[in-house]
Amino acid sequence: MKKKNKKHKGIICSWALGCLVGIMPLSANAQRVVFPQAKQAGTATLKTCENKFVLGNNLLQVSYSVNDGVLRFDGCPEMDLLPSDVLFRMRLADCTEFSSSDMNLESVTSETYTADAQAAKGAERFEGKGIKAVFTRGNMRVEWRAVLRDGSHYLRTEMSITSGKDVTMDHIKPMVYAVDNRKAKSAPVVVGNTRGAVLLSNKIFAGLETPMGVNTNNVDSADIATINNRDIIPMEGNWVRHTTLKAGKTWKVSNVVGLVAEGQPRRSFLAYSERERAAAWHPMTIYNSWYELNIDRNNAPGNLGKYDPDDRRNLKGNYSGNMTATQCEDVVANWKEKFYDVYGKAPVAFVFDDGWDAYGTWTFNPNFPEGFKNVDRMAREMGAGIGAWLGPVGGYGASGEYRRGYWQGRGGMQLSNPAYYDYFVKCSSDMIDKYDFRFFKYDGISAQFSAVGPDMTDAGLENCEAIISIENDVRKKRKDIFYNTTVGTWASPFWFHVSDAVWRQEGDFGKAGVGDDREQWITYRDRLVHQNFVDRSPICPINTLMTHGVILSRFGDVSKTMSYDGIVREMRCAFGCGSSMVELYTDYKLLDEIKDSKGKTGGLWKQLAYCMDWQQRNADVLPDIHWVGGNPWDGEKANIYGWAAWNGKKATLTLRNPDVAPQTLTTTLRDVFDIPAYIKTSVTLRGSYADQRIGKGGISGLPVGKAVDIDKKITISMPKSSVFVFEGVDNGHFEFGEANK
C-alpha cells in the first residue's frame, strides 16, 4: 500500500480530494463488476477539522472523532451504523479483555493512497484516502486503519497487531458495529452455512475479510424470524486465535461494511469482492498432468518409507514408477505441435501434479535431474508458464505417509511447526525464482470430504491460518501468482482475498443423474456447485472454482464414454460456467485420436481453441457469472440449468439440459441476467458456436439475432443431453461506471 502520512496537530479544516486523472483508463481493467446502480461512489475524500475525520464519497460519509484520548466511530447514516466508542475488542488466553477505548491512543494520522496501474489487486489500481491510528497497551501495539478508495461503495478497516513479548491469545473482534434497525428496517443476517459467511440485509453487507472469521448478529437462530422487531442489531466479526502471538511477529486482519443496491445483493457484494480479491479475475486455462501422468503412479516407496539421516534429500529408493521429466517434456512438446503451432494458443500454465518430488523435501526426485528447467523453457516458447502440486501437510495415500514420515522427529509436517512453515515458504518461493512459476495447486489442508470450515481443533484452525499466511508470504514474491487451494477450502467468499480458486467439494470424479457416464459426470460436478455455493452459500462468487473442468483420460476411475459430441459439451460447460480457472485433465493422445461425426481426428484440439477464444472474447463480462435455472439433479429429476453474465454492455448465456428427454424453461432475460429493476432495455443474443442448431431439432424459444425485451416471458425448449452457448449485447448501452467519468 503506497501512502503519504500527514499527522494532524491543532486545528485543521480541509477537503482532501482524490485525483480523477487516470481513474477511467484504469477502471476498465480494475473493476469489471461495478456497483449496480446509476449513482456511483466517485472520488474518495477525507475532511479533517480539529479532532474530527470524515471519509466520504458520493454514496457514504463515515465519521470519526478523538475525545479524551479515545478514537470514536461517529457513525455512517447511509449504512444506518450507530456511533460507538469501540473500534475493536481483544481477549487474551488468561481471560483479560479490552477494547480500543481501553488502549492508549498514540496518534491519529491521515493517509493518501496512490494508484498502482500494475497492481494485481483491483482496488490498488485506484487512489484513496484513509485514517491511521496507533494504539498501545503494555507490550501490545495495534495499527488500525479505515480505508476508502475511489469508486468504493464500502468501507474497510484493517488491523496490524504486534507484541514486544510473547502473548497467548484467545480471540480478536476487528468488526464491532451496531445497526439502527428502526431506520434500516432490514436486519443483517448470516447468509450461508460456512465459516466466513457474510452478514447481509437489504441495505448492507459486512464481514471479516478472512474465511476464518465468525460473523454474527448475536441473535439466536430461534429468534431470527422476529429479528426485524428489534431496534438495534449488532454486527460483529470474531477471529479465533488460540495460539501465541510471538514477539516481533505481526498478525493482520481486516473487515468490510458496504452498501447493497436495491434488489442487487449478489452483484453488490461481487463488485466489492472483485476489487478486493488477491488478484483480479483473469483467464487461467491450465493443463494438469494428474490423470495423464500421475494417477495410481505417484506412490513409489521412496526408500520404503525409511529415512537415512545421511540422505538429506531423501533420494534413496525407487521412484521409477512416478512420472518423469521426459514424460512432462513429451506432453508439452505435443501441445506445442498440435495446438500452439496450429491455433496459436496454449494453456496459461502446464501444471505437474503429485509425484515429482522426493518425499518430504519439496525438492525433485531422481526422475527430474534438472528439475523443471526443460519444461519451463518449452512452455515459455509458447508464451506459457508452469506450475505444480504441493501438499502442505503431505498429500494423500502412501506418498503422503512417506512425506509425513520424513518430518517425524523434525517437528512434524504441520504448518504450525515454524521450521516446516519456513521451509515450505522457501521451497515455494524458489520455484518462482528458478522456474518463473505462474501457478500453485496447494492441496489437502484438511481431509474433510465436504468442508464448511476448518477442522475444529486448535491444530486445524492454525493449519488453515498458516496456509493463508503462506499464500500471503509467497505472493510477495509474485503478486499475480495463481493459487488453486483445493481440498480443505470451503464456500466462503473471503477465501478469494487469499486464494484465486477454491474447491467445489467431494470426489474428484463422480456420477449423478441420467445419461451416459460423461453426462452423469458433468451433472455430478455441477450439482455440487449448486448445492455448496448457489444453494448453501448464495453470496459466494462462482467465477473461480475448482470443479475439475474437463477430464479426458484412459487412466483412473473417470468417464470412459469417448463420444466426440459429449466431450465437446463437457468443454463448453467447463468454459461456459465462467470460472477463470479451467482445468484440462486431458490425454493428448485422446485429443489426437477421437473422431468426429465425419470420421476425422484432431477436431477436439480445434474445439478447445474455440472455447479458449470464447473465454478471451468475453473476459470483460465473465466475472459477473451467476447461476441460471434449477438443480442439475435434485435426487429425482434432472433440470435445465446454466450460467449467465451481464455488465450493462455485453452478456453471455450457457444452458444445459442434463436429462435424457427434451425439457423447457420459462423465464425472462431480466431474471436470466439479474438486471436491476430500474433498467429498461433489450438484449440481442447470437450463437457462440457455428454448429449449434437453432430452431427445429435444436434449441427454440430463445430469440437469436434480434432484440428481445428483457421483461418478455420466453419459454426455452432444449433437446435431450444438450448444451448451448450464447453471447450478445445490451441495446441500452448502459454503463454503471458512467457516473465516474
Residue locations for each model-derived region?
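Aromatic- and carboxylate-enriched substrate-binding clefts and catalytic-loop regions
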Residues: 347-552
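N-terminal secretory signal peptides that target proteins for export/translocation
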Residues: 1-9
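Active-site-proximal substrate-binding groove within the catalytic cores of carbohydrate-active enzymes
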Residues: 57-58, 93, 248-249, 467-696, ...
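Acidic-aromatic substrate-binding/catalytic surfaces of carbohydrate-active enzymes
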Residues: 32, 50-134
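Boundary at the C-terminal end of the N-terminal hydrophobic targeting segment
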Residues: 28-30
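Bacterial N-terminal signal peptides
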Residues: 14-24
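Non-catalytic C-terminal accessory domains or segments of carbohydrate-active enzymes
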Residues: 32-41, 87, 105, 627-631, ...
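Conserved structural scaffold segments of CAZyme catalytic domains across common CAZy folds
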Residues: 113, 118-142, 146-157, 161-397, ...
